């Protein structure tokens, strides 16, 4: 078969339910070169501060519901529905839902060029 499908219901969330949910779909999709994650952030919740300097992975975040702030060093970028941001591997980042509604994002990561 030349395609696979997956749904967040197919995998366990790696985030405490009170903060939302985070579902890694890479294995469920049998993806080899790209990671795909669905993330839900409840109001007031944050993602983990991190970068990918250790593995050279660049990331793209796409907001599909709600609004989030992505903190990048001394700057905060606000993203709303249908907005996307790409970050280089070495860029420290942290997602925050400072709004009053649940935010939902698709996170995609793969080897940098």
What are the functions of these language-model segments?
Residues 21-25, 37-55, 89:
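Conserved short histidine dyad/triad with adjacent acidic residue
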Residues 56-73:
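Glycine- and acidic-residue-biased ligand/ion/polar-headgroup-sensing regions
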Residues 31-32, 42-47, 67, 111-113:
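Short, charged/polar surface micro-motifs in flexible loops or helix N-caps
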Residues 73-90:
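Short acidic-glycine-tyrosine-enriched beta hairpin
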Residues 1-35, 42-43:
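A short, N-terminal "cap"/entry segment at the start of jelly-roll beta-barrel domains
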Residues 89-113:
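Ligand-binding loop in jelly-roll beta-barrel domains
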Residues 35-37, 59-62, 104:
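Residue-level recognition of specific faces of alpha-helices
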